[in-house]
């Protein structure tokens, strides 16, 4: 647990650095020279929809994110989901070309979370068919402690959740990329002893480019364990999302339809309580805006323009 808190502290220190000039997201995910032969821009953002993609921020780049999910579009009493929308604000930072960290706060269940993403392998034209990354995250639910029977104690550890993922992606062409995400989500507290504290899931996500700046995306998480898990007595379902990515200069705008209102891995992978089959769908969007905090050495030396 101590290591996880150190991770959150490190993420916060980098995320609160002073902002420098804005730069185009195209530079962040720009194609490398052909002789490098490494695949780039497998996805145009560090998230496919809810879940992480294999993309990393460049060294010294800060990404300010606003993730927003409306309530159930069939909920007339809450003005078709507008009145009970949820939002998450996040700051991600590229420490090196292969390491990035992030810290966020979400309205849904008043949740704070942090993560680290490490790029392990890069897809190349020969020798390496896929890009592989690791993502480790933890979240803290800060809602008030529930009322308990006399003699029972509410522990701080009940608020903690952990996620470990391996991201395996392949860019088949400039127009098509696919990613699979073996995942384990650990819940320190579950509704009943009949449920495991570990939810194992397999995610799959993809991107189809339809124009220079627009792509269609999809994401699905199948739970191998805890498929019948209850959350506050409610049935849970596998998370399914479809979306559109629109790249406009310094930011990527992601518009989606999903049955998951939660935005962290804890919520959308294992605790989605809405179903597409029942028409419980949420409209949502992500906005990503990047800022260059530290210029690469070659640009500081006048060998290029950032």
Located regions from the model:
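General helical structural elements
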Residues: 6-7, 174
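Transmembrane beta-barrel domains of Gram-negative outer membranes and organellar outer membranes
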Residues: 21-153, 160-164, 169-180, 184-188, ...
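A mid-sequence, solvent-exposed acidic-amphipathic segment
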Residues: 180-225
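Positively charged n-region of N-terminal signal peptides that target proteins for export
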Residues: 1-5
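Bacterial N-terminal signal peptides
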Residues: 7-16
């Amino acid at each position: 647990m101590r290591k996880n808190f150190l991770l959150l502290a490190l993420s916060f220190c980098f995320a609160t650095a002073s902002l420098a000039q804005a730069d185009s997201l195209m530079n962040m995910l720009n194609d490398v020279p052909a002789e490098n032969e490494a695949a780039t821009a497998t996805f145009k953002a560090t998230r496919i929809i809810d879940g992480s993609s294999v993309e990393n921020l460049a060294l010294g780049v800060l990404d300010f994110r606003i993730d927003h999910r409306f309530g159930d579009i069939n909920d007339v009493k809450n003005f078709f989901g507008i009145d009970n929308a949820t939002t998450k604000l996040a700051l991600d930072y590229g420490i090196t070309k292969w390491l990035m960290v992030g810290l966020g706060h979400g309205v849904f269940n008043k949740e704070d979370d942090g993560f680290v993403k490490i790029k392990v392998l890069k897809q190349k034209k020969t020798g390496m068919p896929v890009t592989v990354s690791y993502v480790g995250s933890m979240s803290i639910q800060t809602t008030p402690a529930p009322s308990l029977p006399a003699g029972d104690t509410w522990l701080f550890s009940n608020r903690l959740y952990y996620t470990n993922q391996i991201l395996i992606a392949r860019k088949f062409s400039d127009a098509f990329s696919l990613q699979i995400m073996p995942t384990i989500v650990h819940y320190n507290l579950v509704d009943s002893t009949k449920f495991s504290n570990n939810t194992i899931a397999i995610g799959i996500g993809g991107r189809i480019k339809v124009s220079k700046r627009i792509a269609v995306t999809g994401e699905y998480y199948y739970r191998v364990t805890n498929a019948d898990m209850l959350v506050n007595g409610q049935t849970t379902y596998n998370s399914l999302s479809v979306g559109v990515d629109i790249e406009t200069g310094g930011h990527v705008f992601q518009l989606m339809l999903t049955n998951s209102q939660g935005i962290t891995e804890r919520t959308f992978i294992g605790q989605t309580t809405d179903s597409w089959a029942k028409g419980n769908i949420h409209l949502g969007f992500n906005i990503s805006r990047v800022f260059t905090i530290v210029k690469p050495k070659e640009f500081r030396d006048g060998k290029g323009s950032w």
